[in-house]
Amino acid sequence: MLLSPSLLLLLLLGAPRGCAEGVAAALTPERLLEWQDKGIFVIQSESLKKCIQAGKSVLTLENCKQANKHMLWKWVSNHGLFNIGGSGCLGLNFSAPEQPLSLYECDSTLVSLRWRCNRKMITGPLQYSVQVAHDNTVVASRKYIHKWISYGSGGGDICEYLHKDLHTIKGNTHGMPCMFPFQYNHQWHHECTREGREDDLLWCATTSRYERDEKWGFCPDPTSAEVGCDTIWEKDLNSHICYQFNLLSSLSWSEAHSSCQMQGGTLLSITDETEENFIREHMSSKTVEVWMGLNQLDEHAGWQWSDGTPLNYLNWSPEVNFEPFVEDHCGTFSSFMPSAWRSRDCESTLPYICKKYLNHIDHEIVEKDAWKYYATHCEPGWNPYNRNCYKLQKEEKTWHEALRSCQADNSALIDITSLAEVEFLVTLLGDENASETWIGLSSNKIPVSFEWSNDSSVIFTNWHTLEPHIFPNRSQLCVSAEQSEGHWKVKNCEERLFYICKKAGHVLSDAESGCQEGWERHGGFCYKIDTVLRSFDQASSGYYCPPALVTITNRFEQAFITSLISSVVKMKDSYFWIALQDQNDTGEYTWKPVGQKPEPVQYTHWNTHQPRYSGGCVAMRGRHPLGRWEVKHCRHFKAMSLCKQPVENQEKAEYEERWPFHPCYLDWESEPGLASCFKVFHSEKVLMKRTWREAEAFCEEFGAHLASFAHIEEENFVNELLHSKFNWTEERQFWIGFNKRNPLNAGSWEWSDRTPVVSSFLDNTYFGEDARNCAVYKANKTLLPLHCGSKREWICKIPRDVKPKIPFWYQYDVPWLFYQDAEYLFHTFASEWLNFEFVCSWLHSDLLTIHSAHEQEFIHSKIKALSKYGASWWIGLQEERANDEFRWRDGTPVIYQNWDTGRERTVNNQSQRCGFISSITGLWGSEECSVSMPSICKRKKVWLIEKKKDTPKQHGTCPKGWLYFNYKCLLLNIPKDPSSWKNWTHAQHFCAEEGGTLVAIESEVEQAFITMNLFGQTTSVWIGLQNDDYETWLNGKPVVYSNWSPFDIINIPSHNTTEVQKHIPLCALLSSNPNFHFTGKWYFEDCGKEGYGFVCEKMQDTSGHGVNTSDMYPMPNTLEYGNRTYKIINANMTWYAAIKTCLMHKAQLVSITDQYHQSFLTVVLNRLGYAHWIGLFTTDNGLNFDWSDGTKSSFTFWKDEESSLLGDCVFADSNGRWHSTACESFLQGAICHVPPETRQSEHPELCSETSIPWIKFKSNCYSFSTVLDSMSFEAAHEFCKKEGSNLLTIKDEAENAFLLEELFAFGSSVQMVWLNAQFDGNNETIKWFDGTPTDQSNWGIRKPDTDYFKPHHCVALRIPEGLWQLSPCQEKKGFICKMEADIHTAEALPEKGPSHSIIPLAVVLTLIVIVAICTLSFCIYKHNGGFFRRLAGFRNPYYPATNFSTVYLEENILISDLEKSDQ
């Protein structure tokens, strides 16, 4: 009897040991496939053929055939490796990294739990990799390389099972991804679970411990695709379509797209006005903008639905911009607007709607019939194709004239129903030398709905880039098709174009297809499937598949073959060999030659993460995604075969070889034998770095594209080109055209210029990086995936025979060559040395100076290529006086020389001599300056690499109470009594009386000094700037340094009332309140507003010739700040040595988690004057960073965008800014700290359950499920009362910060929510409804006049700015309910430590007792679940009732049956 997969999982993973010991069982191939489908695998040593087994304290290698649950592994969140049997994660202990590896709690902060797989190696942080010791224990080491494979997969890579984020649905975390593993009910779950739910729905936690954080959501359930619409979908009974409204989620477009796909659905597509009205009615009470599947992420096509639905109905907002440079390439639907469709940046985070058909007729069925060959007969002058006849009319007419002309000929304007018909149209237009034609598609409706003129259904669309472009205020729109790709464009119907008529033809018998029996025809070829499984060598021999395996030349032929193999696919894992191979392991895939000349690769159609490696052969996939290509082992793998031969009596096409002799135009570069030219656009030559799409558009302005590599030789040239321009130590990154943005491309990487992908460019390290859809190139032949919205330099590519366009904004310059921060101009004509000195000076440059061997090599390589007959070139060396030493003419010192020592210098006192460089040897010599030679000019970068030296200042003294900093005195004034806090005018008056002004902050270090002194304060401080002249400080100095908040209030378009906005002087504050502005940031506020501190400055007193004590006394090695202890280590050391040195001092390498401590360390580092190591590091080339002490924090302080990409370990420079570099680099010091102790929660209360979900903060519970509901103030107040709660009140800054953090996840979907405030007529003040005063308030520019509050205005919170605003009470807004949490007396459970930690005996005995009790309890639970539930003290996931007709049940948190029974 066969066991089900779920029962197999139970048997292998085993019940708890108290009930039944997990039995060892042989892993058959069938069982292994079942585990691998779940992402579970066994790790086998490739060389030793043994498998890793997790023991109680160490990992060992054991016989794979005696496999058990302790050999089962799974990739989990944050690049963790989870052991199923040991229920722990593989960890690396920094304090003893080369001890045997062990399992740890999966949220342990004591070790590193992050691992990467790359080229069959498992690598951890600091270049440690998983190795095997002599005693078969598994260790981490940096000395050797050990390769690991997945047991039972034929040498497969464990990277094939990398974890992919699973974004939750509904729940209470706004669509955050599941955290695997997560702990619930004292067990670690590595996948979604149904445990604790009566409705049997899958759920997961989004943090590592559910009981602690209560953050959760439902899992996308792939099985729901088989059962139709379950309880988290809503069904439209008229259309039999299901919709899932994820209105409380906040995901990027690609994340939302993935979430829908995981459930067997797609992002919303809207096919007609009826469907749009259904969606609008369902969201009528919401003011929300949601993602739908509309996108233009295919670089070669226009707008499309992500589910492939034809796009013929549109309801664009008039605001939509169709310009090519606009980054908004994903579509949204707004329920509150009549023209509801907009375009947004795809990286924005929004709610989304999924859609799933119950009885959808797959378009592939229609496509399959469209590719079937039908021999057709037509009248003379008409072109036959698959049952129809077509005629191109070469007389230009308007669309309506063309329509009438076809009708007069008993035909109709052409309708296009499939990609097969597009192929015919492209061929017909090409044969007739026509570039564009009318087709029968048009619209005369608002909203736009395109229809065919013959009334046939629109089942296929093929829009051109940026189309369909809807013209405003024009009801009649007509459509044309262009020749190159057959794409469609919206046109003015009055334009005059050629047109094609179409009518039915006469179908002939199949015998006239021209193919042998059993073969199918497409174009000029016949195709057949050999269904016998063979190796590639057998299939490609020409015997079984005469004359050869199939070669595929374009997307039309691929679509035909996909339809062909769909008819024979019977098995789950069927594959078909094609002729593509790399059997010689060259690194480049080519078509296996038949005869002498190989066929060029013109098209590829890879599956996700393919080609996975070099040296393989290619098979086409027979299951979803159907038709995609994958690399397989040429000899061991067996597949069916796809055969191809020309139609009988048809000549085989000859491929013309084009030899690219045309030179590159302007300053584009190439080398002999390459068909394209390249140009590097680096930051020294352009105004700004750009996103991937901006860079592609930039290249397109020249008629080019981002660079692609058609052959390995092109990649080698680009690599050398970068090496020739930049220092090899620079970690520069350049956008190239490699991307996987197109959602219809199955996650496959492609080139933006449609160059076929012929090599395995990306390491399998990045297979799990789904969100990074664009690639950069580094000068070490490395491609790295990044977010497409990142800004980088870029490389463009253009064919040799295409002359680049010159954009209007392009400033042409003579072709200077860039090399390492300077540019060089090579003058090939000969002249005297003095003439060239003048020419170079006129070009704002100097005659060439050479200061290094690298520069010498660069110059020699260039002049050697440019010179004829071994010419010598003038350089900037001149003998200033006869027989004197040679000096550089620009005055720089001669620090490098390359004289020809074998050449005698001629002594001639009568004439001056100048230096030259030989193009043959590269050696220097001297000659009379009047001799004519070619020469080189050199110009340096315009910016200086170091600051100008100021005149030394004298240290002085400051009055008592003032702080000395940087030659001036500062006074920080924040009285303890809030009633003494000042407005800006009073603060400036106070400073003036003290002989100073409000502070002028002149540098980042001074900013840090002030910020560090604000630690513990809760109010912001006035500084010396006003909005009427924010470029000049109050003391008259220009603003050379600024630190404005991104939410600076001066940029906010509207405030409380129109009157408030008029004539309000604004003054600058430095924030010490992170609730509304980032710590230390500047923002404007009403100058007259009281309630702030201030900072004064005045000049130091130098009359006493004071001495700065910081110059006299060294910085102490131990420093205290903000409840932390820091230790400064002064020694040359690597990052690894810094880790060990800190441990020796009973500390750890520092982690920095907020701006206050960062500011303190900035001041310290500036005082020390050199860089220090900090505890940040990366194991994945800068994609993720971790703190070595296990601290989790989102705070960063990078120098710039690229500073995080220059190495694996991080240091802070003398200005406190962070840079990454190689971990083996030596720095002069490191900063250690003693990590603060973590406390248990001070608020153990829990939230009661009603019909809406709650999130706990401190001793209160909040429901955010109503923020998208639009209700009046009174209706919202009544709703909360019915739930036993009240409308939102905000009592302190911590609560305010919590609320803004939670609301931030809603993005732009929520603008305002009601606050539970009222007007007290007795004393004319605003109070909370419970009677307490509104001590915590934030009215923005000015508190409103209470006259406006009587009697029809209420208070709302503006989410984007965190400001309060008066609004009419009858307006409809979202709201938040709030109530006090219930008292919960259960004690917190202790955390589990590492499995090999040394534990005191008493604790060990206690744990043994606990384990025994838990084991016994589990057995009792299996036999008597009711008894166990009565004993339970933990929280189970439970819904009071499963009913999703209301949004309020979207986020019910998980409660226990025990609590339910008490309600």
Swiss-Prot record:
Residues 1-20 form the signal peptide. Glycans are attached at residues 93, 454, 1123. Disulfide bonds join 51-64, 89-106, 178-204, 192-219, 260-354, 330-346, 406-501, 478-493, 617-634, 699-796, 774-788, 840-937, 914-929, 1067-1087, 1209-1223, 1280-1377, 1354-1369. Residues 238-355, 385-502, 522-643, 673-797, 819-938, 965-1096, 1121-1232, 1257-1378 form the C-type lectin domain. One of its GO terms (cellular component) is extracellular region. The gene is PLA2R1. InterPro entries: C-type_lectin-like, C-type_lectin-like/link_sf, C-type_lectin/snaclec_domain, C-type_lectin_CS, CTDL_fold, FN_type2_dom, FN_type2_sf, Ricin_B-like_lectins. Residues 38-161 form the Ricin B-type lectin domain. GO terms for biological process: negative regulation of arachidonate secretion; oxidative stress-induced premature senescence; positive regulation of arachidonate secretion; positive regulation of cytokine production; positive regulation of DNA damage response, signal transduction by p53 class mediator; positive regulation of podocyte apoptotic process; reactive oxygen species metabolic process; receptor-mediated endocytosis. It comes from the Eukaryota. Interacts with sPLA2-IB/PLA2G1B; this interaction mediates intracellular signaling as well as clearance of extracellular sPLA2-IB/PLA2G1B via endocytotic pathway. Interacts with sPLA2-X/PLA2G10; this interaction mediates sPLA2-X/PLA2G10 clearance and inactivation. Expressed in podocytes (at protein level). Present in lung macrophage (at protein level). Highly expressed in kidney. Also expressed in pancreas, amnion, choriodecidua and placenta. Isoform 2 is expressed at much lower level. CDD domains: beta-trefoil_Ricin_PLA2R1, CLECT, FN2. Residues 21-1397 are extracellular. GO terms for molecular function: carbohydrate binding; phospholipase A2 inhibitor activity; phospholipase binding; signaling receptor activity. The secretory phospholipase A2 receptor form may be produced by the action of metalloproteinases. It contains all extracellular domains and only lacks transmembrane and cytosolic regions. It is however unclear whether this form is produced by proteolytic cleavage as suggested by some experiments, or by alternative splicing, as in the case of isoform 2 that shares all characteristics of secretory phospholipase A2 receptor form. The chain crosses the membrane at residues 1398-1418. It is found in: Cell membrane. Pfam families: CysR_MRC2_N (PF24562), fn2 (PF00040), Lectin_C (PF00059). This is Secretory phospholipase A2 receptor. The lineage of its organism: Eukaryota, Metazoa, Chordata, Craniata, Vertebrata. It comes from Homo sapiens. It is a single-pass type I membrane protein. Receptor for secretory phospholipase A2 (sPLA2). Acts as a receptor for phospholipase sPLA2-IB/PLA2G1B but not sPLA2-IIA/PLA2G2A. Also able to bind to snake PA2-like toxins. Although its precise function remains unclear, binding of sPLA2 to its receptor participates in both positive and negative regulation of sPLA2 functions as well as clearance of sPLA2. Keywords: Cell membrane, Disulfide bond, Endocytosis, Glycoprotein, Lectin, Membrane, Receptor, Repeat, Secreted, Signal, Transmembrane, Transmembrane helix. Residues 173-221 form the Fibronectin type-II domain.
